Amino acid sequence: MKETILIILIFFNFTIVYNLKCGNDKLRHKPPGKLKEKSNSRRKLDNEYKPMKIKVDYTQVKIDTYNAPDVFEKLKISLDLATHYFELLLSIKGSDYEPLDHTILEEECSVDNVDPNSTNWLKEYDLIILPTYINETETNDVFASAYPCLVNDNDYKPVVGKVNILPNFDFNKNNIIIFLQTVLFHEITHFLVFHPFLLNHFNAIKIEIVGEEVKSYIVSPRVIEKARIHFGCNSLDKLPLEDQGGEGSAGSHWEGRYMLGDYMVSTSYDENVISDITLALFEDSGWYKPNYYTGGLFRFGKNIGCQFFENNCLIDQKAVFPNEFCDKSREPKCLSSHLGTGECYIGDYKSIMEIPSKYQYFKKEYLGGLVNVNFCPAANAYFESDSQKAHYFGTNCRYGASLNIFEHYGEVIGNKSLCFESSLVPRYSPQPYKWRSICYKMACDRINKKIIVFINDLNVTCPYNGGILKKVKGFKGKIKCPDYNLVCTSETWCNEMFECIDKKSETDYSTYILQNNEDL
């Protein structure tokens, strides 16, 4: 349930970004119902993991959208896609249950209408999803909510989940399908594993109380193993959960200060990526075996070391980790995954709230970054044009809209593009150059260990360790190159998390191994 799913209202200078929420605080607080397994059934005795099979019952949501068939069609396409990717991503051990009367589903999941033919669904499927389309709140800042409503009586594995989509989407916007798909992927994760009831069951959570402060951490073994590898910190023994934003965010999402960009933080930017760390949580539950190929798109905090957890994001008003954080409002900055463009976000909270003293990084104590990043200033999507505003993921390098202005010379939106911070313009240009975050087509030269950037008819070769190139043939201005190991170590190229799942067993040599610049 993507607790905060990005809607940005930006004016000038220091302003506040308001985020749409997922309705976790609207969820029922009683435990889910329980289903008993048959004893000694063939399906139960088969102890092998097999690809998950999911059944979606569209009975109620079709009724809810009776007067808007186009809305139903888009919801169905998006939910079918989201469930398809879970079937590719997760394997599960089979269980066998007694016949399931549809009235039990209606009662436990608070759904008025369930297909009466649901009795034997669990003979074939591992998970049932019941979607609805109901406005549960008087506000328009909530997108969706989800929870497990029936679990296995023995091991508490989720069997039936409900997801409610609220009518707060703009179904006429470009990219509505991929945006809905991403929201629903987040929501389904909540009733598969990332829900307080489920986390407590398999002892994934550790609670620490210091004074009046209560902090929740994930301490399960595979999560810690993957986190140690990603951050480069062998002594790491716990990973924080979100503690801001009330019930709708706290305790059911990763702490954005450390996991920004992962699809299970409480705010979505124009990037959503699956990390090995989140997949490890699925495995730690004991219910699932995940496919760990994620394309290496989660790049926030990669290889920084234990200091990432020991130091503040800003010291003396300067960013300690400049790849992750920033200290100049409106400064052009790529999102952490380099999947989208953005700028440094610093908001003025003076009339909104008092920033906790431990998160005050500026002399003006009312200035800070987004709430779910512990007010650390970081890159945030910023919509400059009407064409970008007409898109969900409007600043994404794969799905967004190019600005088509001279300062964005050479920009390409597409499936081989990443974000670069650049001020490059043609040398003949009479216009002054200035820094921008721009989407360029690029490739990873795995033979020579370099990044190649394509700007119209010219190629720019970035050094292995990255850094700022001050002189580029044919251009005036500069370009900041990311480290090769940050964006080019994956076996397969992808610049979108669902594409990464699709390519889990492929190798895209045309992108990676450059031979005489063919097919580029």
Language-model regions: role of each:
Residues 18-182, 190-514:
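Extracellular zinc-dependent metalloprotease catalytic-domain scaffold
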Residues 2-19:
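Cleavable N-terminal signal peptides of Sec/SRP-targeted secreted and luminal proteins
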Residues 515-520:
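Long, low-complexity intrinsically disordered regions of secretory-pathway proteins
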